[in-house]
Amino acid sequence: MGVALIVLAAGQGSRMNSELPKVLHPLAGAPLLAHGLRAGAALDPARIVVVTGHGAAAVEAATAQLAPEAICVRQTEQLGTGHAVAQTAQALAGFGGDALVLYGDTPFISPETLLAMQAARAAGADMVVLGFEAADPGRYGRLVTDGDALLRIVEAKDATPDELALDLCNSGVMMADAQVLLRLVAGLSNDNASREYYLTDTIAAGRAEGLRARVVVCPEAETLGINTRTELAAAEQAFQARARARALEDGVTLADPATTHFAVDTVIGRDATIGPQVVFGPGVTVESGAEIRAFSHLEGCHVSRGARVGPFARLRPGAELAENTHVGNFVEIKNATLAQGAKVNHLSYIGDAAIGEASNVGAGTITCNYDGVFKHRTEIGARSFIGSNTCLVAPVRVGDEAMTATGTVVTQDIPDGAMAVGRTRQENKPGFARKFMTMLRARKSAKGAQ
């Protein structure tokens, strides 16, 4: 029957000091919630249930975008993790597989770790808990074990001195048969210091029924939870450090690794070169051999082999650069395709457009794509030349091997092989400049004498 993924995302996150629900704060270009969903996808879940609470409407809207197949259930009162899991009973009614409990504010659990938990279940453990050896166990719940058996989980505030001396700690992540887990959480008590229903108490309850519980240990860094802006900033730094190291190992040249910023889904091919101060937003693929020069910002775009971007370029969602294209300094590309060998080298905006093979777009060219209500497309054919400071008023098409004269405002289609000229004819007035400047200086002198 597969695995049901339960993501707990109901917490208020008051220490974030924000109107935005904690799980929607961005990390590496994606909300915290997305990271747990991304890791859980490694198990190919048959069902996804997200438990919402604080800011439920916003979290549910985000969930619909991140995982349209997910079911959202609300925890109207935040009475603990066990109570949160209990809210999934209806959504998981009749589900015959395992349930994996993850947390919307714990973004670094790796797919490999979750697969190890699944392997422990397959090896005979009825319940599997993810643990870690903490450098500073202080506030974490402790895992009390006997050999390879997990006996119970004790929250720090309820632990004895001997239990507090343990350094094997609880991450909160758990896997068990879904119906067994739901039965156990339904029987929990809130007789503890916080008057909450702890998911951790299901281990002792399960052992009382003869269930076997085991621990899978992961690096402490994977269990980092986000509760404050400081922790969020630290998590961003940790993610970027890992992403930079991975890129270098994969054969990417980073001119200044410390100033390169990746998103969680950035894909960069071997032998690509990334200059200093480059920022990758979500949804970027850069193929092998491409070059991204300094101070460029990319999101939602595809850069093909041999393409060159920047410096100081911006690629927005929908930008598609074919092989050996050039996008130069202070150029913005949005929802536009550049065919092989096309060049837009200076000071231009290209939006909602298609530029043909080997065409050249001169400095200062603008596609005027927005009429105040609707967006319109511009098409430029192959091997065409767009003169500097051209305005292309969409919808409009420039044919193959066509040209525009410098400063032209194009409002009609240009046939193949034609040149468009649309500007005021220059008129020279002999001697006018000297007369005009003499007049202005006289006015200035008269004004100063007053």
Swiss-Prot record:
Gene3D superfamilies found in the cross-reference section: Hexapeptide repeat proteins, Spore Coat Polysaccharide Biosynthesis Protein SpsA, Chain A
Binding site for acetyl-CoA: A363, N369, Y370, S388, T406, R423
Residues involved in UDP-N-acetyl-alpha-D-glucosamine binding: 8-11, 22, 75, 80-81, 103-105, 141, 155, 170, 227, 316, 334, 349, 360
Major location category of this protein: cytoplasm
Sites where the protein binds Mg(2+): D105, N227
Enzyme class: transferase
Top-rank taxon: Bacteria
GO MF entries: glucosamine-1-phosphate N-acetyltransferase activity; magnesium ion binding; UDP-N-acetylglucosamine diphosphorylase activity
E.C. number(s) listed in UniProt: 2.7.7.23, 2.3.1.157
GO terms classed as biological process: cell morphogenesis; cell wall organization; lipid A biosynthetic process; peptidoglycan biosynthetic process; regulation of cell shape; UDP-N-acetylglucosamine biosynthetic process
Residue ranges, annotated region (Pyrophosphorylase): 1-229
Segments for region (N-acetyltransferase): 251-450
GO cellular component: cytoplasm; membrane
Pathway in which this enzyme or protein is active: Nucleotide-sugar biosynthesis; UDP-N-acetyl-alpha-D-glucosamine biosynthesis; N-acetyl-alpha-D-glucosamine 1-phosphate from alpha-D-glucosamine 6-phosphate (route II): step 2/2; Nucleotide-sugar biosynthesis; UDP-N-acetyl-alpha-D-glucosamine biosynthesis; UDP-N-acetyl-alpha-D-glucosamine from N-acetyl-alpha-D-glucosamine 1-phosphate: step 1/1; Bacterial outer membrane biogenesis; LPS lipid A biosynthesis
Pfam family, one: NTP_transf_3
Cofactor binding note of this UniProt entry: Binds 1 Mg(2+) ion per subunit.
Keywords in alphabetical order: Acyltransferase, Cell shape, Cell wall biogenesis/degradation, Cytoplasm, Magnesium, Metal-binding, Multifunctional enzyme, Nucleotidyltransferase, Peptidoglycan synthesis, Repeat, Transferase
Chain spans, region Linker: 230-250
Stored CDD domains: GT2_GlmU_N_bac, LbH_GlmU_C
Active-site feature positions: H346 (proton acceptor)
UniProt catalytic activity: alpha-D-glucosamine 1-phosphate + acetyl-CoA = N-acetyl-alpha-D-glucosamine 1-phosphate + CoA + H(+); N-acetyl-alpha-D-glucosamine 1-phosphate + UTP + H(+) = UDP-N-acetyl-alpha-D-glucosamine + diphosphate
Cofactor: Mg(2+)
The family this protein is said to belong to: In the N-terminal section; belongs to the N-acetylglucosamine-1-phosphate uridyltransferase family. In the C-terminal section; belongs to the transferase hexapeptide repeat family.
Function per UniProt: Catalyzes the last two sequential reactions in the de novo biosynthetic pathway for UDP-N-acetylglucosamine (UDP-GlcNAc). The C-terminal domain catalyzes the transfer of acetyl group from acetyl coenzyme A to glucosamine-1-phosphate (GlcN-1-P) to produce N-acetylglucosamine-1-phosphate (GlcNAc-1-P), which is converted into UDP-GlcNAc by the transfer of uridine 5-monophosphate (from uridine 5-triphosphate), a reaction catalyzed by the N-terminal domain.
Assembly and binders: Homotrimer.
Protein name stated in the entry: Bifunctional protein GlmU
